[in-house]
Amino acid sequence: MEVLMAERANLVFHNKVIDGTAMKRLISRLINHFGMAYTSHILDQVKTLGFQQATATSISLGIDDLLTIPSKGWLVQDAEQQSLILEKHHHYGNVHAVEKLRQSIEIWYATSEYLRQEMNPNFRMTDPLNPVHIMSFSGARGNASQVHQLVGMRGLMSDPQGQMIDLPIQSNLREGLSLTEYIISCYGARKGVVDTAVRTSDAGYLTRRLVEVVQHIVVRRADCGTVRGVSVSPQNGMMPERILIQTLIGRVLADDIYIGPRCIATRNQNIGVGLVNRFITFRAQPISIRTPFTCRSTSWICRLCYGRSPTHGDLVELGEAVGIIAGQSIGEPGTQLTLRTFHTGGVFTGGTAEHVRAPSNGKIRFHEDLVHPTRTRHGHPAFLCSIDLYVTIESEDILHNVNIPPKSFLLVQNDQYVESEQVIAEIRAGTSTLNLKEKVRKHIYSDSDGEMHWSTDVYHAPEFTYGNVHLLSKTSHLWILLGEPCRSSLVSLSIHRDQDQKSAHSLFVKRRSISNLSETNDRARQKIFSAHFSGQKEDRIADYSDLNRIICTDHSNLVYPAILPILAENSDFLSNLLSKRRRNQFIIPLQSIQERKKELMPCSGISMKIPTNGIFCGNSIIAYFDDPRYRRMSSGSTKYGTLEMHSIVKKEDLIQYRGVREFRPKHQKKVDRFFFIPEEVHILPGSSSISIMVRNNSIIGVDTQITLNIRSRVGGLVRVEKKKKRIELKIFSGDIYFPGRADKISRHSGVLIPPGTRKTNEKESKKVKNWIYVQRITPSKKKFFVLVRPVVTYEIMDGITLATLFPPDLLQERDNVQLRVVNYILYGNGKPIRGISDTSIQLVRTCLVLNWNQDKKSSSSEAARASVVELRTNDLIRHFLRIDFVKSPISYIGKRNDPWGLGLLADNGLDWTNINPYSKARIQQTLNQNQGTIHTFLNRNKGCQSLSILSSSNCSRMDPVNGAKYHNVIQESIQEDPLIPIRNSLGPLGTSLPIANFYSFDRLLTHNQILVTNYLQLDNLKQPFQVLKLKYYLIAENGKIYNPNPRSKILLNPLNLNWYFLHHNYCAETSKIMSLGQFICENVFIAKKRPPLKSGQVILVQVDSVVIRSAKPYLATPGATVRGLYGETFYEGDTLVTFHYEKSRSGDITQGLPKVEQVLEVRSVDSISMNLERRVEGWNKCLTRILGIPWGFLIGAELTIAQSRISLVNKIQKVYRSQGVQIHNRHIEIIVRQITSNVLVSEDGMSNVFSPGELIRLLRAKRMGRALEEAICYRALLLGITKASLNTQSFISEASFQETARVLAKAALQGRIDWLKGLKENVVLGGVIPAGTGFRGLVHPSKQYNNLSLETTKKNLFEGGVRDILSHHRKLLDSSLSKKFHNTSHNTIHQTIIYRIYNDS
């Protein structure tokens, strides 16, 4: 007993946690020492002990064990503070969106990581035996990052595209997630349930493909006799010691190892732990080991090249199916790999920059000419040095020199005082490494509506010369000047002053308009009923956004209703005024609102009809009158009478709708009577079919319940029709007759019967008193009856003449103007008319048609321009419709009846709706505008008003559409220069006519492009803003005015203008600081003790105040593309800028299983094959230079295949190791050997054996070359595992994998033979598999292969470095081969890869 105690005392006692890795090591050492049987006993005891202890101690996990880290609160608060500052900088336009995204991700990632590091120390201090803490090292799901999500914070998540979502999840799972955090978390937490399911299937399929490639590889020989090996060097320290040991243990040496003269290990010796330790201790020369790559066999492997069996630690047995073991060793751990893409999402990797810190306090000095200013990735200012830069730091007693490498960012200024350890420079990481970058585009969208403006020059992207994509050449701001775009070009606003001229565009609209689509001529036309206009102040703009498309294309016109003639007490004044009119003007007075109330005729009397461009052609309708006698409240249909009885109008000559511009004779045919057949119609939604209480074809009385909330207004026959999404329920009033004979009825179906006709189908015949409409109803096949419906007859009378509409004195001097009255029927024959919610239906419309005598001599067509003039007398506002005749050469675009309206080009450039945007013709016109402008000057001193008319001589303009140059000629005011410098003037932006003084500045309206700015009188501005101006001109910071797209109309809200009142002391300096048109970023202080300004453009500078139009800055860096044109209107959500930035696509985007699969299928993006091709060329060039042509190709190709194999093994191992999965290299090597051992036969060689383009095994090609004694030309090829499975020697194996029919058909046509060498084909056919015990029955005793002596002929062809490159190949060419080789023609060898160095047999 004492002896035992003494022995035990000598044993080493380990007080350590044994994890999985340590357990593996323990078991392998036990097997080495005691063998398999004894080890299993020991392990049983360990198992029993473990279960006993676990039962005794048993930890439980409760929710209270999840202790949140105390420092979390202030860490998160700090990060939030940083994010807030970042957000402000973005708002002020100091950083752009990409920089903001990068910075915010870094802030939150750092916070999350810091919390994670805090976690373990916190547990150790507060509760070392906490179950959560104990479990956090158990591996699998119990690792630090899982626990971090429970007690730290969940952190940043990726979206499905792998982009980071920059909103971090601040809560942990213990605190619980908010709704937003939960949704984001669902994005990132794919790797939960879904991942596990997907991963299992993916890993299963990967295993299947791997096994398919290598199922035939079995250990068949003891030694293949190869002299080649792969060299592993313990000297250079490139490989970590752990990996070196893993690589070496279990292998077989390919060469003797010497230390000095002493041999410490011999060829074919098994490497154990002791030997490895000696190698590491002695730092031996590179060790050459045998691997599956070096084995000389074609379809099997030898014991020595495979090495030790992982199960029992001895050399592998003959007949072992090592291929299948390899496939499963790689495939099975696939389920442990994650499918996740790592946290970085690639946004800030490649940017973990190294920092240079100041060695001491002091002033920093450097050569300023060697650096130029730039921005860092986060948008901070910095200097970029393009060459090495020497920086000196002068402290009190010492000078420090710091060398900063090229392409680094200097973060301090010259002569700045720096403190010790302050970061002074950032070295760009990844300049030397080969990690690939991917280009990413990020679009920035507009936050608000407004006009685009940029403050720098841009140039067209070369591929978008005609598009609207511009590239920025330097860092600058893009501004969106806020304003609400008027989505329709039909309505505009003007500030309405006394005696101003108003064009037809600027009528105020008081109520929102309603839209009513009426069916006419089988084509939907748009009628817009808008409300009255007046000069009153409380005006709102009409909402036309929904009608915009229809109006623009269909060119229907706004209808301004209810303007009646004036019959007022002061008409003598008016006639005096109007009698002076010239020949080319025609003025119609209109009624004002005050008088309309006194009128007996209802409001909807005469409605004005003015085209959108204000231009009339001949024969236009200028007004219409809806006669109340032809108005119905109920639905029904119109009939023009039957063709038999009243053949007045042929069907195709039906009266057309009012929208035609010119009347052809057929439209003026008089219809002296028409008929209206009333019916009651209810349109119900399709879902309400259940609630209808009456049946189809039933007869009901008045006030019958039809549905739950509708009662019938008339009695009669019910018809229910189902349309697509609705139900039409009609009630026809009338009498029902059951006829005697069918033939009479057929004549009277759907016809109108005049009075006096006898009803023949009754016993006693009565005469019909009124018109009736006979309609045949067939409820079922056998039954039918006739419905006789009452008809309302309308006679059309020519009661209305011009004399009833206008005072006679106005109609005397009509000169060449003709007005005619024409009646229309608005609805076609038999068309159903639907009344919508008790609105009345107008059946006949009386139209006023304007025409004038055309001047036949002149070729140009004469057009009339309409405008509304307002005159105020005795505080009574009068409106006149003034029609001016202008002679103008009008350019027509395309065909006469093009789909965009009449194709007229408006002479004032405002009627853009008519321009056909697809027309290629150049449109050039010079228009002489005979339009006067009534304009008042307010002279405050005299207190009286004077009237001045700017006539057409004062404003003219040339407007070629493509040249877009504007010549502004306004007498005695402006030089002929389209860019007006106005930088230093007071007054609103865009004006250059100081009238009297700037207090009485008034609106000047001309048709000059630059001055058409409806500016407001400044006195009005100080009142609460109601309606602000229509259109601004953009002014650049250099003081030039740019006229933006004349189509755009911007309305400004009161919210968009900021009015700042300045103290009078600051006025003088303010006007210097602020020039008109200047852009101001937010947070600028204009005066002391004043609040900072909002960002915007200065549009008005006065003595005591400034008006700033709100604008939002967007920062853009060089290379960004700007969408849209200068001055273009942007709506909220439109793309403004696209940034192109690089993010590194290092190994962390695809991870885990997808990555392994990518490598094995050889289709990775940074594809190995690409690298290999480059590498081949590189090797070939270098070696050709060193060795001359034939040698170069020969050795280059061999090295390429060796390099690619090693590279593939390393890539696959890297993925598994990163996930903590250990796989022995030899398994991966067996797989890689299979996918790299195929070659493609080139065109020019071996034509008698292989066809060009055929895939053959590398060793087969070599053997064939030896047999035929000629050089073979082929290319090395990387096949993916799927392709390799479909290119094996066995067609049965291929057919059982994929594409069975194709493989078998091809094999039959080629006459392939399957030698049944692999396992799978034998399983398919039910034979004995050639592995394990089945292998011994196949092998016949033969002459031992490895008794052959190996000749080694040493030639000093290669010395030093080249010998290293060639991986210590023992056997080089003997002299006979080299002679043969040099005799081969020069051309054959060129550009071919020839594997003939090693004479293998």
UniProtKB/Swiss-Prot annotation:
It catalyses: RNA(n) + a ribonucleoside 5'-triphosphate = RNA(n+1) + diphosphate. Pfam families: RNA_pol_Rpb1_4, RNA_pol_Rpb1_5. Keywords: Chloroplast, DNA-directed RNA polymerase, Metal-binding, Nucleotidyltransferase, Plastid, Transcription, Transferase, Zinc. Its EC number is 2.7.7.6. Its main location: plastid. This is DNA-directed RNA polymerase subunit beta''. One of its GO terms (cellular component) is chloroplast. The keyword Nucleotidyltransferase applies. Belongs to the RNA polymerase beta' chain family. RpoC2 subfamily. In plastids the minimal PEP RNA polymerase catalytic core is composed of four subunits: alpha, beta, beta', and beta''. When a (nuclear-encoded) sigma factor is associated with the core the holoenzyme is formed, which can initiate transcription. One of its GO terms (molecular function) is DNA-directed RNA polymerase activity. InterPro entries: DNA-dir_RpoC2_beta_pp, RNA_pol_beta''_euk, RNA_pol_Rpb1_3_sf, RNA_pol_Rpb1_4, RNA_pol_Rpb1_5, Rpb1_funnel_sf. CDD domains: RNAP_beta'_C. Its cofactor is Zn(2+). The gene is rpoC2.
